[in-house]
């Protein structure tokens, strides 16, 4: 990218309006430009015919619409798409699209790698490099919309849902993720409703509180264990933010919208967290929580120590939760033949750091930059 030019994908509508005013342009031009970029899917300013030649020339001199580069695309036997996207820094991230009869869900990454080191997740094994910019996050949506369009041009409505469940912990890239989600929900851009944009977090409590105040999106929590002892092993951030604090926040997260529920994701690991006593502990943990539970069959990756629970074990676990009034769904595994399923996204991370260094890096970034700190079925985000 030309360092002298501004990447317009980093701007939401109000920011774009302010930018054009600063460039001595009429404010209404922002709506036209915003729609050209996100609704129509045009990058070439010369093709934005209603902007006027003078403005088009100015945009060519001052601005750009830079995107990650698609370096590989795989399509699963079940129709799932996975794109490997190369960033300007040379790192790669992955984005996944899951088609279903009445909707299409895009799984979007928020970081290059991940710092949280969940033991059952392939992304964690890649180390952590950096946060994605707003442009790199919304660029995944832009590219997927283009690739999925019938004529490989005008953006259509094949993407009906977006889940921030790709590589990284979204809440450790708070400002950029919220900015990108706001663009997703803008009627002048992608027009997704608040119930069709879901953020999945491992439980970064201060940022969960912030998110609750500033964004109406759906919330999913990567729970995966019913006790602190087990969750400390599977999801190490639990040592900092234990279950008692996490569940307390989840109980009141949608207090002003009593019909909305927090989704709890629970990967089923053979002999680890899938026994009847674990189900009983989970029932007790979620008592009086407005919750639904997604049971996720574990998706293996190279050198993992874990195995997937049997179908019979998963069904028995689900039935026990349902018997006690907890709405529970077993997630259908999609894209596992191309390593696009939940927990399998890895990308390609350069300059990988150790676990302790990752935390130090995030801690430093959070002090200096406010912006620091998979597959899914149709029933899960309705």
From Swiss-Prot:
Keywords from the named record: 4Fe-4S, Cytoplasm, Disulfide bond, Iron, Iron-sulfur, Metal-binding, Methyltransferase, rRNA processing, S-adenosyl-L-methionine, Transferase, tRNA processing
Main localization, broad class: cytoplasm
Organism superkingdom: Bacteria
Domain Radical SAM core: 100-336
Compartment list: Cytoplasm
Binding positions ([4Fe-4S] cluster): 114, 118, 121
CDD domains found in the cross-reference section: Radical_SAM (cd01335)
List of residues binding S-adenosyl-L-methionine: 168-169, 200, 222-224, 299
An example Gene Ontology molecular-function term: tRNA (adenine(37)-C2)-methyltransferase activity
Keyword Iron-sulfur (UniProt): yes
Enzyme class per UniProt: transferase
UniProt EC number: 2.1.1.192
Cofactor(s) essential for the protein: [4Fe-4S] cluster
GO BP terms: rRNA base methylation; tRNA methylation
Annotated cofactor note: Binds 1 [4Fe-4S] cluster. The cluster is coordinated with 3 cysteines and an exchangeable S-adenosyl-L-methionine.
Reaction catalysed by this enzyme: adenosine(2503) in 23S rRNA + 2 reduced [2Fe-2S]-[ferredoxin] + 2 S-adenosyl-L-methionine = 2-methyladenosine(2503) in 23S rRNA + 5'-deoxyadenosine + L-methionine + 2 oxidized [2Fe-2S]-[ferredoxin] + S-adenosyl-L-homocysteine; adenosine(37) in tRNA + 2 reduced [2Fe-2S]-[ferredoxin] + 2 S-adenosyl-L-methionine = 2-methyladenosine(37) in tRNA + 5'-deoxyadenosine + L-methionine + 2 oxidized [2Fe-2S]-[ferredoxin] + S-adenosyl-L-homocysteine
Disulfide bridge map: 107-342
Keyword tRNA processing: yes
Gene Ontology cellular component annotations, sorted alphabetically: cytoplasm
Family per similarity comment: Belongs to the radical SAM superfamily. RlmN family.
Role this protein plays: Specifically methylates position 2 of adenine 2503 in 23S rRNA and position 2 of adenine 37 in tRNAs. m2A2503 modification seems to play a crucial role in the proofreading step occurring at the peptidyl transferase center and thus would serve to optimize ribosomal fidelity.
Further information: Reaction proceeds by a ping-pong mechanism involving intermediate methylation of a conserved cysteine residue.
NCBIfam families to which the protein is assigned, alphabetical: rRNA_mod_RlmN
Protein name (Swiss-Prot/TrEMBL): Dual-specificity RNA methyltransferase RlmN
Organism annotation: Legionella pneumophila subsp. pneumophila (strain Philadelphia 1 / ATCC 33152 / DSM 7513)
């Amino acid at each position: 990218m030309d360092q002298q030019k501004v990447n317009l994908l980093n701007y939401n509508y109000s920011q774009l309006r302010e930018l054009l005013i600063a460039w001595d342009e009429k404010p209404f031009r922002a709506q036209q430009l915003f729609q050209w970029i996100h609704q129509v899917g045009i990058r070439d300013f010369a093709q934005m015919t209603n902007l006027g030649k003078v403005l088009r020339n100015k945009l060519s001199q001052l601005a750009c619409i830079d995107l990650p580069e698609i370096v590989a695309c795989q399509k699963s036997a079940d129709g799932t798409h996975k794109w490997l996207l190369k960033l300007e820094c040379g790192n790669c991230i992955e984005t996944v699209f899951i088609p279903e009869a009445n909707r299409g869900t895009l799984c979007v990454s928020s970081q290059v790698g991940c710092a949280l080191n969940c033991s059952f997740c392939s992304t964690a094994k890649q180390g952590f490099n950096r946060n994605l910019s707003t442009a790199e996050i919304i660029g995944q949506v832009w590219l997927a919309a283009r690739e999925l369009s019938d004529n490989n041009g005008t953006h259509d409505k094949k993407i009906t849902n977006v889940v921030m469940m790709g590589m990284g912990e979204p809440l450790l890239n708070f400002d950029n993720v919220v900015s990108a989600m706001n663009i997703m929900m803008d009627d002048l851009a992608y027009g997704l409703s608040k119930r069709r944009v879901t953020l999945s977090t491992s439980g970064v409590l201060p940022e969960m509180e912030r998110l609750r105040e500033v964004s109406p999106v759906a919330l999913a929590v990567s729970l995966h264990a019913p006790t602190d002892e087990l969750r400390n092993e599977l999801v190490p951030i639990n040592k900092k933010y234990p279950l008692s604090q996490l569940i307390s926040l989840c109980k009141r997260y949608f207090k002003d919208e009593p019909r909305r529920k927090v989704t709890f994701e629970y990967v089923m690991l053979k002999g680890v967290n899938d026994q009847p006593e674990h189900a009983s502990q989970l029932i007790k943990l979620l008592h009086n929580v407005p919750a639904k539970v997604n049971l996720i069959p574990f998706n293996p990756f190279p050198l993992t120590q874990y195995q997937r629970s049997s179908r019979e074990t998963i069904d028995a676990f689900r039935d026990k939760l349902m018997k006690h009034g907890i709405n529970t769904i077993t997630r259908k595994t999609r894209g596992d033949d191309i390593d696009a399923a939940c927990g399998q996204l890895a990308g390609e991370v350069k300059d990988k750091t150790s676990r302790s260094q990752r935390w130090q890096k995030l801690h430093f970034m959070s002090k200096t930059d406010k912006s620091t700190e998979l597959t899914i079925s149709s029933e899960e985000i309705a």
